[in-house]
């Protein structure tokens, strides 16, 4: 695997794990407001991001390269968001992630 491709895969792995943490933090916010259905949906989204990261990790390892996870900062999620604001935050994060994926 070329260095450029490995870097792109490493960046994508980090992005997927960042998305996991963002969805989990949003799920915590939903749970804190007794929005259990919303929280469950957000946790499911977080779990999917872990699956995505693992696929990139496995693909990289299968090709004899060594994946590296980059720096993951704590998600910036405000306390007290409304249900609408939680979904808007999830959508904004997903749009950012998709735009990054299409640019690399």
Give names to the regions the model predicted:
Residues 1, 11-18:
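Short, contiguous, pocket-lining structural segments
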Residues 1-6, 71-92:
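Acidic/His metal-coordination segments adjacent to aromatic residues that form catalytic metal sites
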Residues 9-13, 33-35:
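All-alpha RGS (Regulator of G-protein Signaling) helical domain and cognate RGS-like helical scaffolds
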Residues 25-28, 73-75:
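Charge-rich amphipathic alpha-helical interaction elements
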Residues 30-33, 93:
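Residue-level signal for short amphipathic helical patches enriched in basic/charged
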Residues 32-71:
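Conserved alpha-helical segments that form or flank metal/cofactor-binding pockets of metalloenzymes
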Residues 101-104:
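Conserved small/polar residues in nucleotide/adenosyl-binding loops
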